[in-house]
Amino acid sequence: MTLGRVLSIVLSCLLIHATPTLALTDKEIIAQLRSPENSTGNIADAVETVTGHRGWMSADMKPLFDVKIVGKAVTALMTRGLKTDNREYPPYHLQILDTAEPGSILVYVMEDGLNVAAIGNLMATTAQIRELEGIVIDGAARDITAIRAIQFPVFTRRVSPATSVGRMIPVAKQIAVMCGGVLVNPDDFIVGDPDGVVVIPHDAAEAVLKLLAEYDQKESKMMPIIKREKSILKAI
């Protein structure tokens, strides 16, 4: 083998190892998270392993009907307060509803407002028409019979007939918020299913997906053993 040929092979190897792995697009990440194998249970385990922090929201954060949602967060914060002055409060909670990209998940946080509804049928219908993925509320929802009838995904900690109008003041939009005990930044990935809601920090998503693939492979090997041996201990 000539020296030129050797150098060519070495150079090729160096180029292969130097070529960075192409990052997944957000759409590709969402598509993988949508897989039935990727439940919020496994995702919660993966997020905690990758980040060292809890990613699952409060156990009382539940869907109005069984559904799975996956998308990127668009946030709004409201706080308790009566409008007793002449100041104008921008309707941030409505602005994000009218401007969020299709496929987004709205995250509404009602500070000290668990007993008042952040949304009802009108807002849910608007979200559905705008092709949003769903709404997550650290607070309450109302008109749930109508929302169930149109089958728009809403995850909420409580249900209440009380309106937020006159009780809650819009504070900000597209900021970091604490929702269900978990930090949510705009564009973080949100996954909700009948078990609850999990937040995946945007920059941790690919590492989480890699771990989820390992979980799936491991569980796929365990299930036949469980069925054959009728034992969980033998499968572990």
What is each stretch, according to the model?
Residues 96-138:
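Extracellular/luminal Protease-associated
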Residues 55-58, 78, 107-109, 117, ...:
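General beta-strand structural signal in soluble alpha/beta enzymes
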